[in-house]
From Swiss-Prot:
Gene3D superfamilies: 3.30.420.40. It comes from Nocardia farcinica (strain IFM 10152). The gene is tsaD. NCBIfam families: gcp_kae1, T6A_TsaD_YgjD. Required for the formation of a threonylcarbamoyl group on adenosine at position 37 (t(6)A37) in tRNAs that read codons beginning with adenine. Is involved in the transfer of the threonylcarbamoyl moiety of threonylcarbamoyl-AMP (TC-AMP) to the N6 group of A37, together with TsaE and TsaB. TsaD likely plays a direct catalytic role in this reaction. GO terms for cellular component: cytoplasm. This is tRNA N6-adenosine threonylcarbamoyltransferase. The lineage of its organism: Bacteria, Bacillati, Actinomycetota, Actinomycetes, Mycobacteriales. Binds 1 Fe(2+) ion per subunit. The keyword Metal-binding applies. It is an enzyme of class 2 (transferase).
Length: 344
């Protein structure tokens, strides 16, 4: 069983490990508080924590019922990174259930879960590069084994890509969450209408790092210039702005991800995280992987967003790799680095 509570989704998932290295999905329960955050234009940590408190026990019961079991053989939980208060709810629940059931407890990394969940659809994972893109994270990772430490090749130096989507969507009056709203608006737009900048793509820039604050600022300045010229927000070419912004983000993400895979000598690229549900990120990744001779693995959108199944899948791989259980005294770590797969 895996429990996830790092942001605004309360997830409980159950998987069964098979000797051939595959995981079978038995239960996937997710309760989201996203509607409670919409009027604030972003996730409010206190609201998220209270929502987890209300949702965690019912989600546990539903998952056990769906799997047809009384208790799991082991229990894994997201110990970090994430919102401090949100993490505390999931970790406290996991410790209590593990103690009551007398089952092994594993404190795992949220980001590793986003990689591991792909095995539910595509089977055992070969050495690969993983691109994780969400509201709080943008990382390029080198993965040799899900039971081994993951190497971070690069990350964003400022805004996460998903955060930039949310902020630009709010600027354009498209609402929250911004990712789906921008994606929908961009479908009717011209991705080449506006030449927005591609951050950190110069010859002297870090090879695998990202920056989206300049792009976000460029969109804001474009809108401000139109407003100074007397154009109201409602009269702006929103589809063109959305499509051009989305193209800039997808261009940089996929270019650097394919480059990293080639540099690492692997033939597989894995996408994970909620923002990889974006249609342009997926389609451009497909185009560039095909051109580079890489295999692209992308979980279905439901598994890309936060869920308990991803933590259960990571837990199954960690256990199969011989990891010892975590002590019940471990504390959640909101800033846990991706290189720490488990706090033991």
């Amino acid at each position: 069983m895996g429990i996830e509570s790092s942001c605004d989704e309360t997830g409980v998932g159950i998987v069964r490990w098979h000797p051939d290295g595959t995981c079978e999905l038995l239960a996937d329960e997710v309760a989201s508080s996203v509607d409670q955050h919409a009027r604030f234009g972003g996730v409010v940590p206190e609201i998220a924590s209270r929502a987890h408190l209300e949702a965690i026990v019912p989600a546990m019961r539903r998952a056990l019922s769906a799997a047809g079991i009384a208790k799991p053989d082991a229990l894994a939980v997201t110990i970090g990174p994430g919102l401090a208060g949100a993490l505390l709810v999931g970790v406290a629940a996991a410790k209590a259930y593990a103690a009551a059931w007398d089952v092994p407890f594993y404190a795992l990394n949220h980001l590793g879960g986003h990689v591991a969940v792909d095995t539910l659809e595509h089977g055992p994972m070969p050495p690969c590069v993983a691109l994780l893109v969400s509201g709080g994270h943008t990382h390029l990772l080198h993965v040799t084994d899900l039971a081994a430490p993951i190497v971070e090749l690069g990350s964003t130096v400022d805004d996460a890509a998903g955060e930039a989507f949310d902020k630009v969507a709010r600027l354009l009056g498209l609402g929250f969450p911004g990712g789906p709203a921008l994606d929908a608006a961009a479908r009717d737009g011209d991705p080449h209408a506006i030449a927005f900048p591609r951050g950190m793509t110069g010859p002297r820039d870090p090879r695998y790092d990202f920056s989206f604050s300049g792009l976000k600022t460029a969109v804001a300045r474009h809108v401000e210039a139109a407003q100074r010229a007397g154009v109201a927000i409602a009269d702006l070419p929103i589809p063109d702005i959305a499509a051009s912004f989305q193209e800039a983000v997808a261009d940089v993400l996929t270019m650097k991800a394919v480059r990293a895979a080639q540099d690492m000598g692997v033939d597989t690229l894995v996408l994970g995280g909620g923002a990889t549900a974006n249609s342009r990120i997926r389609s451009l990744a497909e185009e560039r992987c095909a051109a580079a001779g890489l295999t692209l693995r992308v979980p279905k959108p439901r598994l890309c967003t936060d869920n308990g199944v991803m933590i259960a899948a990571l837990g199954a791989h960690v256990i199969a790799g011989g990891a010892r259980p975590s002590p019940l005294t471990v504390a959640s770590d909101p800033g846990l680095p991706v290189s720490v797969s488990q706090i033991a």
